[in-house]
Amino acid sequence: MKGFFITGTDTDVGKTFVTACMLRTLVDKRIRATAYKPVQSGAQWREGKWIAPDVDVYRKVIDVTDEDGCTYLLQTPCSPHLAAKIDGVTIEPDHIVAHVHQLQQTYDFVLVEGAGGIAVPLVDDSFLIAHLAQLLHFPLIIVARASVGTINHTVLTVEYAKAFGLQIAGIIMNGFSTPKNEIEQENIRMIEEMTHVPVIGEIPHMTNFSHQQIVWRKEWWQ
């Protein structure tokens, strides 16, 4: 079965947008694909129920319920291990793996979006996003910012992933100026040189995005 594990160098770097764009590409190619957020903190209350905001973005591409798109929906917008404690929920990694295996019975390609970065704890410090990626055996896509500071964040994320023996398919950098400035160009060069991992996607800055913008444009691929 095919899939990717999408992680990031930080929270709010664009993982959900990248996941949705990749999902759109797969669906447009008539590949049976879905996106899945194992643990979602910061649930939103709408129309009398809690909604998973990232799964709501996936719904702009495919018809997916919160139950299919997320195993643990937590209310407090903080690290999953703490949000689970506040909500009185125990995160069971085996349940997440079983959920992915269930999705693989229906879909040919599964995109798994992590929470925050790769060192984010799911169960205190005993089980991190990196451990979950190990269990699922999907290659990583690392989403990084294009701006100043990204070299350090991205190199550390790559080295941490390598320490866990994780395969990295590539880095997607998000939030470039149009056209890219000299600093951003140098960020790409140094990240590739220092990590030996290719930057496979370059996404321009967007203040927000609509249904029509959730599409992977060919000029973003590198």
Curated annotation (Swiss-Prot):
Substrate binds at S41. GO terms for molecular function: ATP binding; dethiobiotin synthase activity; magnesium ion binding. It is an enzyme of class 6 (ligase). It holds the Pfam family AAA_26. The active site is at K37. InterPro entries: DTB_synth_BioD (IPR004472), P-loop_NTPase (IPR027417). Keywords: ATP-binding, Biotin biosynthesis, Cytoplasm, Ligase, Magnesium, Metal-binding, Nucleotide-binding. It catalyses: (7R,8S)-7,8-diammoniononanoate + CO2 + ATP = (4R,5S)-dethiobiotin + ADP + phosphate + 3 H(+). ATP binds at D12, V13, G14, K15, T16, F17, D54, E113, G114, A115, G116. Mg(2+) binds at T16, D54, E113. Its cofactor is Mg(2+). It is found in: Cytoplasm. Pathway: Cofactor biosynthesis; biotin biosynthesis; biotin from 7,8-diaminononanoate: step 1/2. HAMAP family: BioD (MF_00336). Homodimer. Catalyzes a mechanistically unusual reaction, the ATP-dependent insertion of CO2 between the N7 and N8 nitrogen atoms of 7,8-diaminopelargonic acid (DAPA, also called 7,8-diammoniononanoate) to form a ureido ring. Belongs to the dethiobiotin synthetase family. This is ATP-dependent dethiobiotin synthetase BioD. The gene is bioD.
